[in-house]
Regions:
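ABC ATPase nucleotide-binding domains
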Residues: 30, 71-77, 81-225
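Helix-to-loop junction immediately C-terminal to a conserved catalytic motif
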Residues: 49
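Conserved coupling/switch loops of ABC nucleotide-binding domains, chiefly the family-specific signature
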Residues: 55-58, 208
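Conserved ABC transporter NBD signature motif
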Residues: 57-65
Length: 325
């Protein structure tokens, strides 16, 4: 099974939300659409689901054109940020409703619901209403509903953005086990790069309705195609040195080091970054972030350096990556 988007355009009023968007998602592959609010990632998902109609372009699932196919006939499993559960129905009834609409015997429906509730560890909440559930439990009910659709494609729109950090971390393995790595293509929309890098096989970084770069998490980190991608991927974000001779130089904070033979600098601030320290230092090239081990002794007048092989170079006008020498 494959998902293909070709030259998708979508405008709302005067605003061009998607501009010639092209995307391929293979069988069992998870592609994350990553970008800032308003970049078009959720609109792309709604077009695939059939909840909106593109102005131009093609959407194909397994080679079949979907643009004019109603949403209810597209067989997509969509999980929303807001859970989209019926508040007056309990968990079992929320799951059963979709199965009733699609037909089948009561015995088959019951067996499938019991099975998915057991897998998602929700058997004890089957008769509870959404208001009686925790945020993590409500999201698992939404996942269960998507699984019961037997979809050709999974579409997940910021499914964990309403959960706290620990719950998101706990749910990731379940998401990967149940939806990602199976037979269906998965499109995962998020603004959280850590989530995208943890779950996706490839990440499409979106900007103003276009894909700025698509690649594996490692490719985007090591070979960012532009200053936009360079600063969007990686935490702390890449240092960009002021342009010199039309070239912007980028240095990852992990590649900077304290060096007694380096350039003098002044420490502006220091904070803990996991087990490491993150320093904000000022040197003759500007203000830079530097990450070093937590036990590092910081001198009163530190000096810094970095290997030239770790530099990234970008055109100062276009922001695009320059080829290596």
């Amino acid at each position: 099974m494959t998902l293909q988007l070709r030259a998708i355009n979508k405008r709302f009023g005067e605003r061009q939300v998607l501009n010639e968007l092209c995307l391929d998602v293979a069988n069992g592959e998870c592609v994350a659409l990553l970008g800032a609010s308003g970049c078009g990632k959720s609109t792309a998902l709604r077009l695939i689901a059939g909840l909106d109609h593109p102005d131009q372009g093609s959407i194909r699932i397994n080679g079949a054109e979907m643009v004019d196919v109603p949403a209810e006939r597209r067989r997509v499993g969509m999980v929303f940020q807001s859970y989209a559960l019926f508040p007056h129905l309990n968990v079992w009834e929320n799951l059963e409703l979709g199965l009733r609409i699609r037909g089948g015997s009561a015995g088959t429906r019951d067996e499938r619901i019991r099975s998915v509730l057991e897998v998602l560890q929700l058997s004890g909440q089957a008769r509870q209403r959404p208001s009686q559930l925790s945020g993590g439990q409500r999201q698992r009910v939404a996942l269960a509903r998507a699984l019961l659709r037997d979809p050709l494609v999974y579409l997940l729109d910021e499914p964990m953005s309403n959960l706290d950090a620990q719950l998101r971390e706990d749910l990731r393995p379940q998401l990967r086990r149940l939806m990602i790595g199976g037979e269906q293509p998965v499109v995962y929309v998020t603004h959280d790069q850590q989530e995208a890098m943890a779950l996706a096989d490839r990440i499409a970084v979106m900007r103003e309705g276009c894909i700025e770069q698509i690649g594996t998490p490692r490719e985007l980190y090591l070979q960012p195609a532009s200053t936009y991608v360079a600063q969007f991927i990686g935490r702390p974000q890449m240092n960009l040195l002021p342009a010199k001779d039309g070239v912007i130089t980028g240095i990852r904070p992990d590649d900077l080091r304290l060096d007694p033979d380096g350039s003098p600098c002044t420490i502006l601030s220091r904070e803990w970054f996991g087990a490491n320290q993150m320093l904000l230092v000022r040197c003759d090239r500007g203000d830079l972030r530097l990450v070093c081990p937590g036990e590092t002794e910081i001198e009163a007048e530190p000096r810094i350096s970095w290997p030239s092989a770790c530099e990234h170079h970008f055109d100062a006008v276009s922001g695009l990556r320059l080829p290596s020498d």
